[in-house]
Amino acid sequence: MSSLPRLYYVTTGLDEATAFATWSAVLAPLFEPRGAGPGKKTPTGSASGVIIGDIIIAKVTFAAQDFVRDAGRIAVTPDHLLLHLYMTGGFNGEITRQQTTIGPGKVAMIDLAYPVNTRAFASSTISLIVPRMLLDGVPLDRMKPRLDPFRNDLLAAHI
């Protein structure tokens, strides 16, 4: 039995330019990271995970930053569904066509077919990235960016 492919990207300890370049490259299929707040500190983060077929599961930690997904990025990258469980931290902003606030213990349902514009706090998350083709028949157009408390707790426990 062969082992599953793994992802491991750490920016801790790298010089600022290399850390930003690495973090930007890791996020490129999903978002553009931008400095947030008055100081606009260079955005950095780390991700480690596993690829299971077409699905990616990863633990992701990052400093406070803005995440942007615009029409240009949408046109040239996959429009997967990103389920993002925030263990710590959270964000405010627009995902899945709605203004949303997500905090610790909550799952963000991010439809990458639409623009994203969020301001994130320093966070630790578990991410599940599912290709749209695996969700055939699921009415994603009715999906909300937040789950009701029961479904959120059930999905968070499962993740």
Locate predicted features.
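Short secondary-structure capping/turn segments at boundaries of alpha-helices and beta-strands
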Residues: T44-S48, R69-A71
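His/acidic/aromatic-lined binding-pocket segments of jelly-roll/cupin-type domains
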Residues: G49, R73-A75, H80-L85, T100, ...
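Glycine- and acidic-residue-biased ligand/ion/polar-headgroup-sensing regions
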Residues: G53-I55, F62-D66, R73-G93, R132
